[in-house]
Amino acid sequence: MKLKQKILTLVLSLCVVAACLPVVASAETAPQGLWTDYAASAFDGGSGTKADPYQIATAEQLALLAADVNSGAGSKTHTKEYFKLMDNIDLSAHVWTPLGYETYASGGGDAKAFQGYFDGNGKKITGLYVDERTGNSWGKNRSAGLFGVIASIGSEEPIIQNLTVENGTVFAGDGNATSGDWYGAGVLIGRINPMHGTAYAVIKNCTVSGTVSSTKNAAGLVGDSNYIHFENCTADVKVNGYSTAGGFVGNTFASEFTGCVAKGDVTSYGWCTGGFAGVLYWDTTVKHCAAFGNVEAGDWRIGGFAGFAQTNVTIANSIAAGDVKSNLSNWDPKAGGFLGEALYDKGNNNGQESEFVKLEKCHAAGKVTTAKTDGSIGGLLGSDESKNISVVGCSFDNVKNASLAGVGSNPTGTYGITAQNTAAVASGICENYY
């Protein structure tokens, strides 16, 4: 009993600490020049094989990798080649050009993606400053981060691992919330897609911190993720977006997240905003993940963990510890302490409903407040439009949310949601997450 009380006290303390995390301010003055103009002529060593990876020991050598990949020229694409960081790197002297890029133009665009393996070797990159807003002379990249665009090559080997990026600053988009051009941004990766078909790739043991601002798909670690497994990664990032914004990932398709954490606050002026993910879509699984930041949005579909989940999405043993605030006053906010909205997609399989959303042993510890007091507002789930949802062993704090039911609107069946006091919710978190 004493051990359980000690663990319960620790969980409550962690929630308080997470809510009080300092906000990392972005750089007031941008560095001068682009790192690709200062690229080295060679790496520090290695031949690019798994046994003998190219060695990167300086900022100039890292810039060489970016310049090579972005050139798209022959062997410089480094497809299926290996890289290893040999020392900590400071990028504060110049603006970083994302490693791998894509551009958009009327009638077509261009893309040069990173298609290799990068081992951070336990080292740290500091001083990252990326500004791909279209108002800049160089701002033509749709996806921004240390890596702009990655095309995964379908190997079970981690394509990025053992890397820390500390206090990075990333901008994407044109700074105009009404723009029709969409961008993706994360401190580590702007966008990642499979190179061939639906082959999965792995990203593991990566930690990032800083600030991210993007017109769309703004997130702490990765803006847009497709067919990727993330393992034991953490994002402590203040995120500002217009739509599809999340503390860890903005938009995701057919991906898996295990043991991942989002610590930063998320603010969005648009729709689909969550403490961990803006959108979880199509065959996506989340296990033992947490969102500790507060979430605030100006449009619908907002949740402490995810704004929106649709089509074969499972979230298990995961928590949302931050508060949720919707500023939408003239429309249904679809706001939930854990998930904003669960939605059914299309059709069935041989007469059986084949699309589902599952929440298993998930908990919401924050307070939900909305500018519009009626509508789809729930302690755990804002709106259920899924037609085929399973909720088992979940809870929300009914002390902080005394007027709310577990589901705000359109209940489709029996929900395993318990309204509990603060200590009981923390106990559930202790049992199911830690």
Q: Which stretches of residues belong to each language-model region?
A:
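Residues within alpha-helical transmembrane segments of multi-pass membrane proteins, especially transporters
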Residues: 11, 15-17
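Surface-exposed repetitive/solenoidal architectures
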Residues: 28-434
